[in-house]
């Protein structure tokens, strides 16, 4: 997944140096997709002086769980704003709200990233990135198909398995260790 999409969608995670697995397929098969109207609207992430807005709405082409997103980064130094169109696919696995995301702009990315999400009692959207080491272990032990490449910071993981098998893996783990501990927190602005 390109840096531009990671920075825009997972601004806080990138600022913290987080890495996450990429997949050729979404986290769940389309039969598990759900429309989640609570995500519709405009959300804002403010982290370490960086401000990123995301406008989310359901896709007219494929409304079952597919959302179009436009991320806009407001630079802190007054330079030009950057934007990235993205696609989200929302689903439920073992009682958890999960999503797959990818860049759909000029530098379209064919791979997906994964997150777990929830709306807290304050109406904030909390997002937990998929844990790279958990998926690296799953590939190394044969629980999932994919490739693991070691790098100076840990591992790069690219899953090639089916959405059905990825969803089954997440379900059998009960979410434990599959997603990070520290959420990205977004405030709804509209």
Predicted regions and their residues:
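N-terminal hydrophobic targeting signals that begin at the initiator methionine
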Residues: 1-2, 20
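Sec-dependent signal peptide recognition
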Residues: 2-10
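C-terminal motif of bacterial Sec signal peptides marking the signal peptidase cleavage site
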Residues: 15-18
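Terminal low-complexity, poorly structured segments
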Residues: 11-12, 140
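Calycin-type beta-barrel ligand-binding domains and close structural analogs
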Residues: 20-38, 46-53, 57-190
